[in-house]
Amino acid sequence: IVFRAAQKRSDIEIVAINDLLDADYMAYMLKYDSTHGRFDGTVEVKDGHLIVNGKKIRVTAERDPANLKWDEVGVDVVAEATGIFLTDETARKHITAGAKKVVLTGPSKDNTPMFVKGANFDKYAGQDIVSNASCTTNCLAPLAKVINDNFGIIEGLMTTVHATTATQKTVDGPSHKDWRGGRGASQNIIPSSTGAAKAVGKVLPELNGKLTGMAFRVPTPNVSVVDLTVRLEKPATYEQIKAAVKAAAEGEMKGVLGYTEDDVVSTDFNGEVCTSVFDAKAGIALNDNFVKLV
């Protein structure tokens, strides 16, 4: 997904990929995607390297990031997407190998600073290793910021109805740490834990301790939804809330936070470029201080 997104940007060039898969299989996985469709471009393998749209991409299969010699291909930023090197100490091996910056594509396992577009990018101070948090946090944080900035959040609960992930089982199987997580993904709605709501408190300190949440894993291949239920400090009608979110989506958060009043369903957001889209028709208000936002 990172690779496909980068192909649409003129200011990003992929120069190297490190994976334990061989280059032929990597080319196959890039060409064909059951969820996002076929790759719109040319993909071939030559002398162990990927050639994508005529551009050569170095392919390596190193287990230790320190051996990657990123400086040989002029790497500026490494997207650390293995899910393994999620601390400053382990991710710093990429810096040792010659990279200038490292972005962890999930939450870190230590105090590596976390940045979410639309929430706290203005706090970035040049750190060489950062976390981009989770997909759920990227969905929740921009909306939570708009609501808190305009109306104040006293407290809130979040539920994410989350699409199936690769760690789940196709049929029931052993899962010693998470018994429910071991049940068949295509057969069940599976309650699960998530740290996404609490992580919002790291990127928006003013909300620290005010939000928590949980997840339901559901049998859909892509697109998840966040249900945010909050108590407001400043009373507001649902129409006022919609207006505030729409203004942000068309203003300072354009391209990050979207807004729709259409009768949409999850597949309508397959390939959506905004990290969060407010579904104006799906939310409800019990009163002017207690609302559910989707």
From Swiss-Prot:
Pathway: Carbohydrate degradation; glycolysis; pyruvate from D-glyceraldehyde 3-phosphate: step 1/5. This is Glyceraldehyde-3-phosphate dehydrogenase. PROSITE patterns: GAPDH. Keywords: Cytoplasm, Glycolysis, NAD, Nucleotide-binding, Oxidoreductase. One of its GO terms (molecular function) is NAD binding. GO terms for cellular component: cytoplasm. NCBIfam families: GAPDH-I, PRK15425.1. Belongs to the glyceraldehyde-3-phosphate dehydrogenase family. The active site is at residue 135. Signal peptide: none annotated. It is found in: Cytoplasm. D-glyceraldehyde 3-phosphate binds at residues 134-136, 165, 194-195, 217. Homotetramer.
